[in-house]
């Protein structure tokens, strides 16, 4: 072998893997003998199983073999498979059938059972034939055995396979076997190599020149493929194409490919003759699979080749339960929706079972991959590479030790240990042993220590880390700044060659200041240890490391180095200059005893991956893995997942125009007062973001020598800008995009202020570029009036404008006007994207008009001009140019437009009402409120009295009235019930329910005397009847205090039953009922219930099931407490003395206990005065929180609140907020009204409502007509009135709602809609009113 040949094979062997022999299919005896000869030198032979011999001795032999080669047989499955392969054909069939019936059989039991059945069978058996050898040891196991031997070098094994096998086979008589059977070696020698290599190694070609037609076809095809490659265009070859792949045995089958990320499955052709994965455009569109452009043109097809210029991102795919991640080229047409190539199966160790039509995945072979070598030019620095250095305790560098400053010394951290499973114990022990061995940790006696936790590595193993969160609370912050990414990238401008260095275990290269080690102690089941080097997880570590590396690099970081933490990028403008720069940096690292991770370093590259970006001479783009992370994101299920998604998007925001606008619907879900509800709006927002990342722009490096252009614009909720620079081709290329959401205060700015805000924010964002420019840069805006405001030297209008003008003095710029139609990019940054339609493919940068609700058609213009003739002032402006110039009004296409780009319209016309209706009811904003609707319309139109007309329209909108809640104070002042003249004349009653069961009771009957405030508490059950309640009231109240005159209670079925009515009639008292859901009516009982519940909690909170035992104590405690309303105790008012409450006091008796005595009368009078005073005070306090009552008159239409009253209330959260409207019949009290409820619900609800539960229904037939959705009209009850509007008859109908069948509604609808709902009633109305239809 020549030296040149050896070097080429050496380079090839570095990239080759043993799995590449998976494609071998052979039946040649010579080849098998060759394999057997090679194998015999490395792996001992294990003969076939003979059931006629001792089974146990063969089991022992196999067991010893498994023990000797553990890497080949890691589990029971591999041992069982090896055992099956060593059975003869008959025994193998029997064993497979036995294993399918009992999958838990071990390989030992498999042999014993087989020996029992087959041991008596006589006859000739197969010996070591070719098929026997293949069953004994397949090609993959052959390679694994070679690789498993310690004395076989990884590299030389690959070299042996690639070189010796073809070379030996060449000597065989059978010349074509190695070409047709060993496909991977053939591909390497014939198809993969360069043309120059083919000329040099002619001895690898078959010696017989008289090949058959088939061989000649193969040779020609290979040549065609090689010639095609010279044109830099790849070719995908399929069986239906002109160019076929004859180098391997081809097999096809169709499987369902599951795409879990997109919740779909597609039929997929598994084709071993294909060299690339493909998918059709139709499939991509149907399942909305994300794609991206592909710069490498690919030809596929036969006689008429086609080009491919797009491919999908890497997709997660499941085939027969095997998960793989791969990408597809997108083609226009193919025989199947998608196809998986042999290469993909190959790379994922997937084999095809042609008999079972299934796929199976083999275990991957672990290979030792050598780290990239240090270039020869830097060999002098080999001693600072990780290859020559093991981790050890670094020497301290004076002034750069890691200091742990604490806010307080006397602190205690929580101590809690967690049991660890065996897997984590092993990972912990490995980390501890390694740390102790290298000296970076030591045992500690610290009294405070943080716990450890485990995080998964990329390869699936666990890494032990210390959770320093408890300690970080006491650590003083380090204010040393981390570099801004944008400023780092700006320093790279002009560089053409790059080298990236990565420090090995970067944090562990810094020593901890002596005396601070105990502060970094950590605890684990093995004990307490402390770090001698800077650990990960401490809050001040990132800032200190940045200070450390900046100090080490010194002045170099100002000229040819940028570094972010342990990532160091060296950049230069020429090759010779770059060598000096790299040596300078390596020397500085060497002087500081720092070690580089050679495997992650890249030397002398034209483009590199650095801090998440691909950086080159032209500019920088985001890394594909960061883009794929966003593209593959599923729909967030909660706020946490949404924040994670927005975090990934925010990292890429400089590449996404209109970021703030695109994320606006998503950010709204993160507000505290917004309930989580995912809608199609949010889904479309995510899709729009993903579309922007399918083909992200290349941002150029900022160059201070080039001309600068800043384009700005503002929309309703955000500002946007794009910074560009002019290059040698006289074109402007973007340096960066910027967008920002406005604050609540900024949303109220005028249009001019918002446009100026866009300029101010953009200048602040790019201040490091724009503040120090020598030549003035250009600012382009689409707001003409803004130029005058900035260049005007007159006194500013307000303090905000004065601050802005002062800020602008720091910049050297000139501002120019460009119409919005030409300001595509900046306008798009700030405008609202239509969230109901996908973004057109060819309009990524087109501006989107945010007030596109009304098209300015010729018909609209003609209608406006016609309206002008009816308005004297506008007609004067239309005909007088001087007047227009004086008032700064322009005439465009016959329309009058003011300085704010608003179209002037006559006031209060049919045209203005149409505009209001379109924006309010037909626009993309759902029934906006008065302020929002006004702001939207004012963007494009204006007329005199516009605000008043919009207010009147919105207030009379039927949909808004019944669905939107009111935020005003409640109606109606408090109307206290006057006190009675004496105790136990006026009572109130209620039940306390939901109590735990105690002695068979689970409720409490509460009776309160409204005069003395005395309470009677009687345990009962929730299921108590009216008869039982009456008996209880008779025995516990009337028997002691006599008959009351009146009782106030709620509308409980007990008190409204006939039994209770008879009971009231018997004892001659009147029942008064509080209003439903109006607790203020019977506030006394509500307050008493709260007090009783508090007392019960105090005495039995620890044993709640004993509350019945404490009722007498609670009642005594309540009745002997001084009441705030009477200034006396209830007991004293009723009984005229105070009982002894403890053994240390005596009861106090009055001299006169007669009820009619003068003293008693005086006490009652005092109590009554106190009650009246309390009522006045209570009314004053309550009335401070209400607004003036709105008086309703009989015949007025009102709506009833659903949510608070329970009236017609359903659990459906999308039900209207109000029911109605209903007619007012009469006023039934100071604040109560009786309504005309439909007969269908009168029996269900009280027809009397407090004014606080009512809202006036505003109805203006001039404004609102056809207010009903025709699908909501069920049965029409009757027709109230009619109107003719624009030659259309509208009917005001009262009807039963289809959406809420228990609701009676009314509203305007067209005659046609009414006829569809109920033809008979409509015809009767037309006939009775003599309407001419």
UniProtKB/Swiss-Prot annotation:
Domain Peptidase A2: 266-342
One Pfam family per UniProt: RVT_1
Additional remark text: Retrotransposons are mobile genetic entities that are able to replicate via an RNA intermediate and a reverse transcription step. In contrast to retroviruses, retrotransposons are non-infectious, lack an envelope and remain intracellular. Tf2 retrotransposons belong to the gypsy-like elements (metaviridae).
Start-end of Polar residues biased regions: 218-231
Binding site for Mg(2+) 2: 990, 1050
Region (Disordered): 199-231
GO MF term list: aspartic-type endopeptidase activity; DNA binding; DNA-directed DNA polymerase activity; endonuclease activity; metal ion binding; RNA binding; RNA-directed DNA polymerase activity
Keywords of this entry: Aspartyl protease, DNA integration, DNA recombination, DNA-binding, DNA-directed DNA polymerase, Endonuclease, Hydrolase, Magnesium, Metal-binding, Multifunctional enzyme, Nuclease, Nucleotidyltransferase, Protease, RNA-binding, RNA-directed DNA polymerase, Transferase, Transposable element
Post-translational events: Processing of the polyproteins proceeds by an ordered pathway, called maturation. It involves the initial cleavage of a 27 kDa capsid protein (CA) from the N-terminus of the polyprotein, followed by the cleavage of a 56 kDa integrase (IN) from the C-terminus. This leaves a 72 kDa protease-reverse transcriptase fusion protein (PR-RT), which does not seem to be processed further.
Binding site for Mg(2+) 1: 502, 566-567
Catalytic residues (positions): 271
Matches recorded under CDD domains: retropepsin_like, RNase_HI_RT_Ty3, RT_LTR
A cellular-component GO term for this protein: nucleus
Sequence ranges assigned to domain Integrase catalytic in this UniProt record: 979-1138
Domain spans labelled Reverse transcriptase: 436-615
Biological processes annotated in GO: DNA integration; DNA recombination; proteolysis
Official protein name in the record: Transposon Tf2-3 polyprotein
Species name: Schizosaccharomyces pombe (strain 972 / ATCC 24843) (Fission yeast)
